[in-house]
């Protein structure tokens, strides 16, 4: 006879074999495809969209149903193409209710490599806003009562692709790759947690995590949420954030915290931008720009307000405040940017990023900048205006005499190593790439002042008209020389001291041409005068102190 121990071993083996056979046979005995209509209806009613699944198969070991196709229809007001489509979807279920009660209880959903289409219309409404809309669900009583209680333990998207289309913008759709998303404890009636990551063109990445819900079943875009956003190495142009024509470029990192009640969103964070360029003809800044910002946005009207926002470049700090409004692809600003006593040494190498050029071989050294600029209009073509004031700075390395041409012979101007500017103030207006400068006041240490107006064209052509006046010791030296000059030359110098010398500045910012207006000095005469016509072929008598006079006038005319 068989011993008791051996009997139990034999029975266990037999039972194990039977169980194994059943486990293997169940997927064949259970036609999972029979559950496809029921699951499609459940998901369609949950989303408010038509959900279509391909052939369903069942895996007992993974406890999941696998469909070889998935399609979720879009809101017909936006597109007839699918909102979501994927080659495969895994639906985790509770095995026992499925086998014994023929009941489907969904525990998880995993969508592999889906293509998701996000569309925004001209009224700033998104195609996902109608997701979960109760008015679009099935009218069956049993479905209506069960849908609010639908919950999914885990909803995942793996290796997705999201295409973002703005119907109000002329720009092509933006495509975001490698989208990974996970929602835990998803329910239409209770809060849930989520995380998301994706890649931008140009090696940029974004990760978002937070909490959402309860789900707004009338408008999904108004579902309350919190979010922690981290963006790394976002290429502003290559990533499609700004069009190339805007002239803005750079690489940005962003960290932000968002809190939304479904009506308004409060955002607080930082931006660090490298290689930043803010003008079409600008060049990348060599150092990073750091921004601290706080903003509140109305999600319905897409209006917002900037508060407690600062922009720092080195030790230079700008305060930014104002409002904005987005309509379609256009965002309009009404903001100010101000600074008080910002060190010019920290701003000098940022000027090329703004498209501002210094004369070739020169640079600003020392001093401070004070300004309060208004920034209005569309973000891709803003109008910037307001007062600008520089104090106690030096334009080093600018050879003035070489720019003065024939006038240098008259005033005796000689090359200088720099121009010490006590004050430079003006009212600036920049629009369309061109600059208007009004009410210019320039005070050069020990030389004099210059006042006037001018413009810089989008091609950087200069057209300035100023009046230069001697003052202090320079004026005294010139006055003593007048007594030794007779005739036309003496009258010219006397007029220059009394009324100022009209000066025209043309050329370009990198190569300006500075020309005293001799015709203006003589009251219109028969034509422009030059050094030869004023002084004769032999010039001034040898006893006239031309060196002192020339240096005095030349310094004022050139160094401004």
List the model feature ranges, each with a label.
Residues 1-48:
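N-terminal type II signal-anchor transmembrane helix
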Residues 41, 59, 63-85, 105-129, ...:
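Small-residue helix/turn framework positions
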Residues 49-54, 421:
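A short, amphipathic edge element
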Residues 89:
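An amphipathic, basic-hydrophobic helix/alpha-beta surface used to engage anionic
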Residues 133-148, 524-525:
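Intrinsic-disorder/low-complexity linker and hinge segments
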Residues 514-560:
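Gram-negative outer-membrane assembly/targeting C-terminal domains
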